[in-house]
Amino acid sequence: MKGQAAVSRIMNQLYDLEPTVEAPDYPRAATELLARQKKHALVIMVTNLRDEDTDDMRAAVHALKKRHSVLVASTRESVVDEIMERPVHGLSDALRLAAGQQYREHRLRYLNELRANGVDCLDTPPESLSVDLVNAYLAMKAGGKA
C-alpha cells in the first residue's frame, strides 16, 4: 500500500487506539508479528516508555529490525512536562523536579540508543501522536525507509 492510501490506513488504525494499564509484552508481539508478516513492512510500536520496559523492548526491536523498518512512538506524559515547569518553593518541589528530570533523561537516553541503532523514534504528547506519526511516516518514506 502506498501514498495517500497508506496514510489513510495508518490514521484509521490509530482512531480507536486506547491506552491500557496492562504491561506490554514486546517480545511476544515481535514473535507473533515476525511469524505473520514475512515481507518487509513498517512496524510502528506505540508505547509509553518506562524504566521497566526497556530491556524487553530492546530485544523486540532488535528482532523486528532484521526484517522490518521500525518506528517507536513513545507518548510523553503531560504531567511530567507540567512538573518540570512548576516553580521550586521548597524541598518537596525540588525532589519532584529532580524525579521528573531523571525520568526525562532516562527516556531520552533510551530513545537516543534506539536511534543510534537505526530505529526511528518519536517522543510526543498523546494529543500530537496521530499528526506526528503521519509526518514520521512521510519522512521515512521520503528517505526510503518505509
Residue ranges and their predicted role:
Residues 1-146:
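Exposed, interaction-prone extracellular/peripheral surfaces
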